[in-house]
Amino acid sequence: MNLSVLLVTLLLLSWTSAEKDLKVRVARSTNDETNLHWVKCGGSVPDGAVSIRNTYVSPARTEYVCKCFCQAGYYSTKDSKCHYPYGTKEMATSTNCYILVNRDNFELLEWKDGYAGSVPDNAVSTCKTNKIYVGKGAYGLGKIEPANHCLYYVWDGAETWTKTYQALTMNKDVIEQAMKDVKYQTEGVTVIKGKPEVMRRSTVNNQHCKEVTKTVTLTKDISTDERWDVTNSVTFGVTTTVTAGIPDVSSASLEISMQATMDFAHGASKTETQSYMVTVSVPVPPKQSCTVSMVAQVNKADIPFTATLIRTYRGGKKTQTTTKGVYRTIQVAETHADVEQCTIIGDAKDCPNASSTITTLRPKLKSKKPAKPAGK
C-alpha cells in the first residue's frame, strides 16, 4: 500500500495590510538619545557647536555654550577656555571643558523666557544629576539654578546674577518623520535559521476494517516582525515614513527587495499576523490512529544600515541628519505538514482478513516547502 500523502494544499489566508492590522512599537536606542551632545574641548570649535552672538560687549563676540563639570558658561576662541561663574568668581578652564554640539543642527533649539529660577519644558540641562540649565541674559551665556532662583553669568571677573533670562530648550513638537536612502550592510550578516516547531496537532482515527481517507485542516496565526532601530530618537505619536528595500530572510540567503514606501503610525516598527492553513488528505489504515502536525520554521536576522532621517515640525520647519541603526526582522521561512506514525487502536480479530488490512506503523511524511506569500 502506498502510504504517501495524497494531497497537500498550503494556503495563506487573510494577508494583513499595514493599514488594517498593524501593531507597532517605538524603535529607538534609548529614551534620551538625540543629536545634542557635550563634546570635550580640543582647541577648536567643533561643527554644530551651539552659539549666540553677544552684542552687548564691545567688540561683539560669538559665545559657544560650554560647561565645566555641571557649570554652564561660554567658550572663548581667544583663549580656548570655558568661562563660567562659580563661587562669586569667574572661572576658566581648558581641561574639564565641554562644548554643546547639535550634530547636523538636527534638534530644533529655541530660547524661551524664564524668571526667578523657572525653566520652560524641555530645557537643556548640563548634567542628569544636577538641576542646572543652559541660559542667557542681556550680558551673555550663563547657568540657570532653579534652587537659587536666578541666572548666574560672568562679568568683569566676577559671578553676577539676574532674575530675568532665557533658557535653551528643545522643540519636540514633531508632526512627521521620514527615513530614506537606507543602505544595508549585508556583508558578514548571517541569517539565523530557526528550528522547525510544531504549531498544531490533530489526530484522526479509523475504527473500520477498511482503509479510509480523512481530510485534516490545521490553522495557526504566526507573527512576523520588522523593526528599524535607529540611534536617533523616534518621536511618539507621529507618522513615520520609511522608504527602503525590505530584506528577505525566509531562505538561507539574504535578498533585498525593490524599494517601497511604508507608513507606520508610531515609530519605525510593525508586527503583522498572518493566518496559515495546512490541509492534508491522509489514508488511515483500519483500526489505527494517525497524528498530523503543522510545522513552521521562523528565520531571524539583524542587519546594520545607514540612512537619512528627516523631521517635520509644526509650522513646517524641517531638519535632517544621517543616522545608523539595525534592521531586525523575524520572517516565516516555511510551513508544512507532517503525518506522524500511526498506532493500532482496535482489535484486529474484529476484522476479516486482518493480516492483509492491518499494516505496520506509518513513517513520518513531510509536505514540500510552500511558495513565498504574495507581496513578500
UniProtKB/Swiss-Prot annotation:
GO CC annotation: extracellular region
Top-level class of the enzyme under EC nomenclature: hydrolase
EC id: 3.4.-.-
Record's subcellular location: Secreted
Superkingdom: Eukaryota
Expression by tissue: Expressed by the venom gland.
Gene Ontology molecular-function annotations: hydrolase activity; toxin activity
UniProt keyword 4Fe-4S, yes or no: no
Signal peptide: 1-18
CDD domains assigned to the protein according to its UniProt record, in alphabetical order: PFM_natterin-3-like
Activity regulation, short description: Inhibited by tissue-kallikrein inhibitor TKI and trasylol. Plasma kallikrein inhibitor PKSI527 and classical inhibitors of serine-, metallo-, thiol- or aspartate-peptidases evokes a minor inhibition of the peptide digestion.
UniProt keyword terms in alphabetical order: Disulfide bond, Hydrolase, Secreted, Signal, Toxin
Pfam families referenced in this protein's UniProt entry, alphabetically: DM9
Modified how: Contains 4 disulfide bonds.
Listed InterPro entries: DM9_repeat (IPR006616), Natterin_C (IPR053237)
Residue ranges annotated as propeptide in the record: 19-27
Family named by the database record: Belongs to the natterin family.
PANTHER family: NATTERIN-3-LIKE (PTHR39244:SF5), NATTERIN-4 (PTHR39244)
Function recorded in the entry: Shows nociceptive, edema-inducing and kininogenase activity with release of kallidin from low molecular weight kininogen. The cleavage occurs at Met-Lys bonds.
Annotated protein name in UniProt: Natterin-2
Organism: Thalassophryne nattereri
